[in-house]
Amino acid sequence: MKNPRLILITNPGSSSRKYALYREDELLCSLHFEFEGKKVVCTLKNADGSKKKLKETFPDLNSTVGALNKILTEEGFLGGVSKIDAILARIVATGEYFTNDHLVDKECLKMLEIAKKRTPLHVPVVANEIEAFVKEFKGTPVIAISDSAFHADRPDLMKYYAIDKDLADKFEIKRYGAHGLSVGSIVNYMAREKILPEKLIVCHLGSGSSLTAVYKGKSLDTTMGYTPLEGLCMSTRSGSIDAAAALAVKRAMKFTDDEDLEQYLNKKCGLLGLSGQTDDMREIIRLRDEGDDRGTFAHAMFVYRVQSELGRLAASLGGVDAIVFTATIGERSAEIRRCVAQKLGFLGFELDNKKNESDLENRHENIAAEGSKPIYVIRTDEFEEMIRRAKVILDGDKCDCGCGCEKGECDCDCNCDCNCNK
């Protein structure tokens, strides 16, 4: 019998590096590198929740990839026949190429270089991380997992802007969307649990936030666009803004180039810009409760934008059968769920306040009142979805949905519609 695969997932940020090691679908440990003063330190977290701060320090975040093999070997996760079999990285990038998952090769590295120039805020960190893994772990498959792939098959009506279509095609200026891994995780989970309705809206509310309309398990429409800047008011992102207003901001702030404006709209706006104090929703709610005007306004803006986009997506679907709240705010903030749901009665939704306030004991809970359409809180698992998708590439002779069956012989209850057995 073949040994279970060890899969390493990388999640690099601008000021930290996070890694998770899995044995197939089972989490073994995670590593978190961050600055402590001028040195980088590492905290290892085991699957049972226990934590250990490693004694070794590192000069910078670019040195973390080179240290992983040594750390995981010393901690007993690697060694002997145990080695990393695949490395996965999430890609949020514009362009048709990155609406698919790719085994990283020379072509993929070339496309990453192009993507760095197109979206300098989102791509360089993960691209550099991928390049480091290719050099450090020679011969180990590195797979770039698209965060937009779930949205790739939407109708053109939902993908194009109202600009010259030839220009949009030539320069690939389209609404690619994001949070596809999160929404895909939710949809696949609901299918397994047999609670997936025909018309669904998934509210991914976190530091980055988006809504996605799902029709028969497929993305129909979503709030993010060419980049994750479009759509809702977020922690530090403005969300949708008139292009002329954005240019007015550039002039008012005396920015010398477009990247300064893009940085401002992505890093200095949203809840942070509105409140003038914080991008943390817990603090925003505290400020509101203390009577702070700007905190109150920031909270109201966040809720309003979710409600208005939810209404738009309901119209796009022609009705909605269920709503899902997920991600950090969606899963943890009963107050945000309560406020958003207050204006959803016209769609047939009403919260049960007691259920809404209860802790999420299972991966999903229906917090709707009796007689209401379902309102679910579901814990997303993007890493689970990344592994499922990676298996499609690693197991070329397997069913395309990642269920593990041989192509043409799928007889499990995965509820996919890949038609590999038809």
Labelled PLM ranges:
Residues 14-59:
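Short glycine-rich, Thr/Ser-proximal phosphate-binding strand/loop in the N-terminal lobe
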Residues 1-3, 122-137, 179-200:
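Conserved phosphate-binding catalytic cores of ATP/NTP-utilizing and phosphoryl-transfer enzymes
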Residues 397-422:
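Histidine-centered metal-binding segments
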Residues 150-252:
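Glycine-rich phosphate-binding loop of actin/hexokinase-like ATP-binding domains
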